[in-house]
UniProtKB/Swiss-Prot annotation:
Lineage, top ranks: Eukaryota, Metazoa, Chordata, Craniata, Vertebrata
Function: In the hair cortex, hair keratin intermediate filaments are embedded in an interfilamentous matrix, consisting of hair keratin-associated proteins (KRTAP), which are essential for the formation of a rigid and resistant hair shaft through their extensive disulfide bond cross-linking with abundant cysteine residues of hair keratins. The matrix proteins include the high-sulfur and high-glycine-tyrosine keratins.
Region annotated 17 X 5 AA repeats of C-C-[VGSREQH]-[SQTPN]-[STPAI], chain positions: 8-167
Stated name of the protein: Keratin-associated protein 9-7
Sequence repeats mapped onto the chain: 8-12, 13-17, 32-36, 37-41, 46-50, 51-55, 56-60, 61-65, 75-79, 80-84, 85-89, 90-94, 100-104, 139-143, 144-148, 149-153, 163-167
Family: Belongs to the KRTAP type 9 family.
InterPro entries assigned: KAP
GO CC, one annotated term: cytosol
């Protein structure tokens, strides 16, 4: 590990969102790392709300794995637990819920709780198709690195073509 987001007291990732920091020994006060089930000794956690680091740990996967590309649901090994999804043919659900396991075979299906139009008019519910140019997809928390996305945390959602960060709003 070469870098940890502040605060950090060791190169081995001493921070509140570090996963499985078994080698941290010199934290200043209370233990500043929390254990989890990441496969490596200390995965660099995703910097919410987006993760585009060289190494990160997908917290939205059923089995968190370290990946080397921008963190998207497709990075996870199947099945991948997405925070919001709706695919009756894949998940066995007919409506959007808080979470559901969607196999990678369902990748072409995009379904979100809210889909934003460029005019900021929103359509509640799910769309069983890709939004395309007429509708921006909301960011998939905790990461969003889609080609086109719509910041759901903005008062006026706008389409951006780069990784979704607060500065995009």
């Amino acid at each position: 590990m070469t870098h940890c987001c502040s605060p950090c007291c060791q190169p081995t990732c001493c921070r509140t969102t570090c996963w499985k920091p078994t080698t941290v020994t010199t934290c200043s006060s209370t233990p500043c790392c929390q254990p989890s089930c990441c496969v490596s000794s200390c995965c660099q956690p995703c910097c919410h709300p987006t993760c585009c680091q060289n190494t990160c740990c997908r917290t939205t996967c059923c089995q968190p794995t370290c990946v080397t590309s921008c963190c998207q649901p497709s990075c996870c090994s199947t099945p991948c637990c997405q925070p919001i999804c709706c695919g009756s043919s894949c998940c066995g659900q007919t409506s959007c819920g808080s979470s559901c396991c969607q196999p990678s075979s369902c990748a072409p299906i995009y379904c979100r709780r809210t889909c934003y139009h460029p005019t900021s008019v929103y359509l509640p519910g799910c769309l069983n198709q890709s939004c395309g140019s007429s509708c921006c997809q909301p960011c998939c928390r905790p990461a969003c690195c889609e080609t086109t996305c719509c910041r759901t945390t903005c008062f006026q959602p706008t389409c951006v073509t780069s990784c979704c960060q607060p500065a995009c709003c």
